[in-house]
Amino acid sequence: MTIAITGATGQLGRLVVAQLRAKAPSKPLVALVRSPAKAAVLGIPAREADYARPETLVGALAGIATLLLISSSEVGQRAIQHRNVIQAAKQAGVKRIVYTSLLHADTSPLSLAPEHRETESMLKAAGIPFTLLRNGWYTENYTGSVAGAVAGGAFIGSAGEGRISSATRADYAEAAAVVLTSAGHDGKTYELAGDEAYTLTDLAAEISRQSGKSIPYKNLPEADYAATLAGFGLPVGLAQAIAGWDVSASKGALFDDSRQLSKLIGRPTTPLATTVTAALG
């Protein structure tokens, strides 16, 4: 029963492939990617499958029993692209779809949520057994800024004292691998988040502790934070989106205390301190 992974060369996808190879070495795997040549490093067969080119999808999904649909990286195009994949999966006879959605997608104020809600609705209407992995925030979304914070003397954001229950990509990848290789998940929705909730003030304190430098958290108004990010060279639209996500975090959008992720993977999620250590190198 072959498992296919979309976006298999991406930051999450490659970790899922590694987990699957470790957990179920005899399980047939297929990487679905835009450029099969770039997937050679994964060590599994690869097929061309471009979300935006429906003509590539049905053939790519031939003979696939279980599909991991990793959400598209193209925000604003996700719903259309996901529809292409779901329709192709139905046509190809895929038996099961596992989808990486967003934490509390049905109620989340995050600007990312509507496309995930729409995709979830498509899956429910498709008639294919499915599982929703509602992934919370990646800790790396914040620790990617650690080096810059140390260099600049402050960690900046707009999340206020919002509590963030993030987990690492590796944690979410392991959860996906568990669901893909075990039974009893059809029709289930998992709200996945880290065990440890923290504020950006807490994150700044941890950076200070590990770096030996005083790195305070500086909370900025949304517009000021967006302007600062744009000043660092980010596209204006992306800068505004990131600032908006932080504001949503200040309202609780990134918090969850159900510990469904650690229950699913059978271990605690990766501590914030561990990810900060990795970021400091």
Task: List PLM regions with ranges.
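Residue-level recognition of oxygen-bearing side chains
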Residues: 38, 56, 66, 260, ...
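A hydrophobic C-terminal alpha-helical subdomain
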Residues: 223-281
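Periplasmic-binding protein-like
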Residues: 68-70
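Oxidoreductase cofactor-interface core, primarily capturing Rossmann-like NAD(P)-dependent enzymes
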Residues: 2-37, 42, 52-64, 73-83, ...
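Acyl-donor (CoA/ACP) binding surface of acyl/acetyltransferases
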Residues: 45
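Cofactor-binding loops of NAD(P)H-dependent oxidoreductases
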Residues: 49
